């Protein structure tokens, strides 16, 4: 890692600014960089409007504004927009919007007539507020990077998942499983990096019921193997729970879910608790869930990857080198 200390007095400085969504992650990033979090006051007016003030100078500084789009998602997003605007008006040298989880990322295209492209709108809002650069982790699709006319640093959680896998399992016993066609490329990278076999599940999404899909067919041999599925996010957990059942029916010894973003909406935690998964491994791009699904959820820290990327940007070093060139999707 590139060491970046927070100098006193004149000269280029990193400023880490964060809102109310995920203070623990921001603190972990701060500790890794040995750079204190900037003093920011965030509250709400009686009518719900966000009130924000940065209580220290940002003039000439490289400002990194950390905020996952989660919880009351629109308030989280608007907090970040206000922080960006405040930094811009305070004459910051550069402003990077650090969005560990980018809201509306699934709405990256028109799936039907008269539908918006939400991901493009979010990027346009960050741009209009004054962001010079955007950083996010495991986007739903690579095309979202093209919505921004500036540097877009795409991080992947593969290094932390790979470390956890090799510390706890023998790769020879594992089959990496893509839960749908959209995750094949990334699942193949995991498979190649770890030296495991690869299997693919064909998923059918309901045309009549929202947020409902099921695993239909399996391509590949999983008999007697530990299957590890990878997806960018777990939302309602409907798809992956049916995937676990399919894999066990095909002879898998054990099934483990890997997912960068543990969104865990609605019935997700109860579904996972009653599912066939032995473990659900997620990163902490989002705050910890209300419960751990009966002890099944394992959380890994994404802070070192984000901190090292911030350090690389500040030092004008390569970001792709941190991920061995695997951070393109």
Language model feature labels by segment:
Residues 1-329:
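PRPP-associated nucleotide enzymes
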């Amino acid at each position: 890692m590139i060491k970046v200390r927070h100098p006193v007095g004149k000269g280029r400085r990193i400023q880490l600014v964060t809102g109310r969504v995920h203070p623990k992650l921001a603190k972990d990033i701060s500790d890794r960089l040995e750079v204190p979090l900037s003093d920011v006051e965030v509250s709400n007016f009686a009518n719900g409007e966000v009130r924000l003030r940065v209580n220290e100078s940002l003039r000439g500084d490289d400002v990194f504004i950390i905020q996952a789009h989660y919880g009351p998602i629109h308030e989280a997003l608007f907090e970040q927009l206000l922080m960006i605007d405040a930094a811009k008006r305070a004459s910051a040298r550069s402003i990077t919007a650090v969005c560990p989880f980018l809201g509306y990322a699934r709405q990256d295209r028109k799936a039907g007539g008269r539908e918006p492209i939400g991901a493009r709108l979010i990027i346009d809002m960050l741009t209009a507020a004054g962001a010079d650069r955007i950083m996010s982790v495991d986007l739903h699709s690579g095309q979202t990077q093209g919505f921004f006319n500036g540097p877009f640093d795409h991080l992947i959680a593969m290094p932390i998942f790979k470390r956890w896998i090799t510390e706890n399992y023998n790769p020879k016993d594992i089959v990496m499983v893509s839960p749908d066609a959209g995750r094949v490329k990334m699942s193949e990278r995991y498979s190649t990096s770890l030296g495991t076999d690869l299997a693919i599940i064909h998923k059918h999404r309901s045309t009549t019921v929202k947020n409902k899909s099921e695993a239909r067919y399996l391509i590949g041999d999983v008999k007697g193997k530990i299957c590890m599925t990878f997806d960018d996010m777990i939302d309602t957990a409907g798809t992956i729970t049916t995937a676990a059942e399919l894999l066990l029916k095909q002879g898998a010894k054990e099934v483990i879910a890997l997912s960068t973003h543990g969104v865990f909406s609605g019935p997700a935690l109860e579904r996972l608790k009653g599912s066939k998964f032995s473990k659900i491994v997620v990163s902490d791009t989002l705050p910890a869930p209300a419960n751990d699904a009966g002890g099944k959820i394992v959380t890994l820290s994404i802070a070192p990857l984000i901190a090292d990327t911030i350090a690389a940007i500040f030092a004008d070093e390569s970001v792709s080198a941190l991920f061995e060139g695997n951070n393109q999707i």
